Amino acid sequence: IPIQILFIPIALVALIPTLYKQGGVSAKLGTSATALEVLQGRLHMHWFGLRDDPPTHELSKVLPNFSALGHWTLLLPLYILYKISGKIFYPVIAPEGEEEVLNLVSNRTIYFDELISNRKGQAEQFVVLGAGFDTRCYGLLKASHLKLFVLDQSATQQLKKQQLNTAQVDCSSLT
């Protein structure tokens, strides 16, 4: 992709604080860097119009171990290309059976969204184990009748709760 070549110097500058926040700051806070992976993938989906996800967008702006600006800078060439061509190169939702590692979060997100939407009328509760910085319970399921539970390691859960409050994301739907 030729446009990306022009952005290599900018991407390198953006990559350093992005990696530092995700790895270094996460370690200092006692949270797992991988707890950010779902948030990262869904944020990218939100930016490219594949999934409306305001809670993820708001949380990403306040987390001390995530650089929304860094991610935006890294994806800017792909976003410009998308706006020019109308084609999304990343993130991509692959057809069923053609998924690859690159599509893991986006495909899994869409699959689970559909599964949850189809079954939530038959359930009483929804439990997210190892939730990390997942925000599904603050958006998609917020208005449901379900009792919602989000479980993770203590440090991750405390940081998430504090930062959701800072971002003014309504958490009242959680039990």
Each PLM stretch: what is its role?
Residues 1-125, 133-174:
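Rossmann-like AdoMet
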